[in-house]
């Protein structure tokens, strides 16, 4: 399963949101990959998520494969939609 997800928090994927992405991804057995600007990373690796350096308004491709892929996608979509708690 693959979807595009937009970064809507003003500061982009800095340390705190990256940690939240990794924590969310780690709750699932499925393989979760995020792609941005010709980089594809493992969403369960904090260093990899930080290296994406995805800014505000970036469109990320999220690909999830596994038995709990629907639940994982729903959780990640909700996390990104919340702006990681940084929206004013």
Regions found by a protein language model. Give the residues of each.
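C-terminal structural segments of small proteins and small subunits
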Residues: 53-88
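Compact, glycine-rich, soluble single-domain proteins
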Residues: 6-47, 51-57, 64, 79
């Amino acid at each position: 399963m693959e979807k595009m997800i937009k970064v809507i928090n003003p500061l982009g994927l800095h340390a705190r949101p990256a940690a939240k992405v990794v924590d969310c991804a780690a709750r699932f057995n499925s393989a979760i990959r995020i792609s941005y600007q010709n980089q594809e990373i493992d969403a369960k690796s904090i260093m990899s998520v930080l290296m994406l350096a995805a800014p505000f308004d970036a469109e990320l491709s999220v690909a999830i494969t596994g038995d709990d892929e629907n639940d994982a996608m729903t959780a990640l979509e909700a996390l990104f939609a919340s702006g990681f708690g940084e929206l004013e």
